[in-house]
Regions:
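Catalytic domains of cell-wall/extracellular-matrix polysaccharide-remodeling enzymes
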Residues: 1-113
Length: 113
């Protein structure tokens, strides 16, 4: 708990020093979250509804196919931008889903809507 809390606070401080804004939301690594952190830090966890397991493959087509065949309204897609294949897939996913009529919104818009 203490290590996670420190990492979140350090990240918030780094983001605030650049943007002048504090973190409101975060994606917990591995989806592991403890309610106590939410209360202590005033940060809301944002979980995902589609995980194409992009970290297990470099096959862009496989990642794209998994997402676009599963995507439904209000889904949150988990991708890792540290992999070139995931970045390439994300660009294709956005184009395909927009062609299908999907709209991409901020977390604020999704949660408050």
């Amino acid at each position: 708990d203490d290590e996670a809390k420190k990492e979140i606070l350090d990240t918030d401080e780094a983001i605030f020093s650049i943007t002048g804004k504090h973190v409101e939301y975060m994606r917990p690594p591995f989806g592991i979250w403890q309610r106590r952190l939410e209360l202590d830090l005033e940060v809301l966890p944002v979980m995902w509804s589609i995980d194409p397991l992009d970290w297990t493959t470099e096959n862009v087509d496989e990642i794209v196919n998994k997402v676009v065949t599963e995507a439904e309204e209000n889904d949150i897609i988990l991708l890792h931008d540290c992999y070139d294949s995931s970045v390439d897939a994300a660009l294709r996913i956005v184009d395909i889903l927009m062609e299908k009529g999907f709209e991409f919104v901020t977390v604020d818009e999704l949660i408050l809507d």
